């Protein structure tokens, strides 16, 4: 089965009433709770809806709103061993993309306290924590976070080999 068919079949099993998918997690999102919506919107369901609620309300409001919970203990789309929720989405929807695998390693390192998994993980953690200080509105933070993850994915696809140093290329030795 090709990837679009697999994704469609999986979405129908998760959301039998049809329409756009709806996902719910804890409020005040950081790494995984921004990375997962980015992944869903870019690779799984561009019309997906995301709800952020107090931790103790995730399951009840998920049932009430027909939303699938993610990134909380005890649900399918969550951490499993050393893997984070982002990994669970990639595995469940069988997404295969070299750049996405690189992004997943960075997200996993930042989200699980293992920054040595990828040099970029510490930077992603710093940016995520900074964004959370700048935005009180979870959906506003999500919108900014989508840009961050778009940039990270573009880097992983096209620019991960690019290096910067001094002096700039083409200037030779600077006296």
Each predicted region: which residue ranges?
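N-terminal acidic, proline/glycine-rich, low-complexity intrinsically disordered segments
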Residues: 1-5
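Non-catalytic regulatory/linker segments of enzymes
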Residues: 6-41, 45-48, 54-57, 73, ...
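Polyanion-binding interface signature
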Residues: 17-115
């Amino acid at each position: 089965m090709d990837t679009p068919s697999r994704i469609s079949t999986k979405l129908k099993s998760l959301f039998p009433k049809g329409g756009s998918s709806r996902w719910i997690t804890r409020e005040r999102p950081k790494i995984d709770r921004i990375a997962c919506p980015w992944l869903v919107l870019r690779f799984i369901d561009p019309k997906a809806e995301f709800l952020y609620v107090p931790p103790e309300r995730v399951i009840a409001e998920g049932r009430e709103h027909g939303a699938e919970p993610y990134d909380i203990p005890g649900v399918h789309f969550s951490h499993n061993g050393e893997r984070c929720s982002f990994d669970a989405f990639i595995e469940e929807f069988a997404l295969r993309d070299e750049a996405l695998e690189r992004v997943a390693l960075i997200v996993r390192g930042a989200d699980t306290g293992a920054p040595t998994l990828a040099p970029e993980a510490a930077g992603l953690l710093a940016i995520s924590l900074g964004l959370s200080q700048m935005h009180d509105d979870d959906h506003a933070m999500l919108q900014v976070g989508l840009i961050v993850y778009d940039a990270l994915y573009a880097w992983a696809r096209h620019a991960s080999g690019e290096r910067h140093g001094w002096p700039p290329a083409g200037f030779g030795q600077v006296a």
